[in-house]
A protein has these predicted regions:
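Mg2+-dependent endonuclease catalytic cores in nucleic-acid-processing enzymes, primarily RNase H-like
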Residues: 1-99, 124-125, 136-139
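Phosphate-handling catalytic cores of nucleic-acid transaction enzymes
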Residues: 132
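Acidic, Mg2+-coordinating catalytic module of metal-dependent nucleases/exonucleases
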Residues: 104-126
Length: 139
């Protein structure tokens, strides 16, 4: 196949360590991914939601106006739509420690995935960056 000798890296949220969707098999979601040959990189616990949203925003455009995160319009239209339409739950703002993403529209799944990889590689907050070299990302 086209990607035969390539590593596929997954950046899921920390809840995959728990026996949730895979409880019937007695393994974790992470174990299922690893057993299928995927490399799994995730934090031991979720960072504050605001930090992960800020990590994405900083890659989309930092304080100096630099952009390091791009989306291919032809290949990722649902991801773009998700990032553009995911909002904070009413009554919560980005400055609040207990901010919540509004999941009532059902559009946040793709933007959640973008948050997980961006926060893991380019964290805002307590965690140290997991990158070895600086690069521009595109989806």
């Amino acid at each position: 196949g086209r990607y035969k000798n390539q590593d596929i890296i997954c950046y899921p949220d920390a809840s995959g360590r728990a026996m949730k969707t895979s409880a019937a098999t007695g393994t974790t979601d992470f174990s299922i991914l690893r057993n299928a040959g995927f490399k799994v990189l995730a934090r031991s616990k979720q960072p504050p939601l605001v930090d992960s949203v800020n990590a994405v925003n900083a890659l989309l455009k930092d304080a100096k106006g630099n952009t390091r995160l791009y989306f291919n319009k032809e290949k990722t239209p649902r991801t773009i739509a998700s990032v553009e339409t995911t909002t904070w739950k009413e009554g919560f703002t980005t400055g609040m420690d207990n901010a919540i993403i509004d999941k009532s529209k059902g559009v946040e799944h793709f933007s959640d995935g973008v948050r997980y990889i961006c926060e893991f590689l380019y964290p805002i907050g307590k965690h140290k960056p997991q990158i070895i070299r600086d690069r521009t990302w595109s989806f």
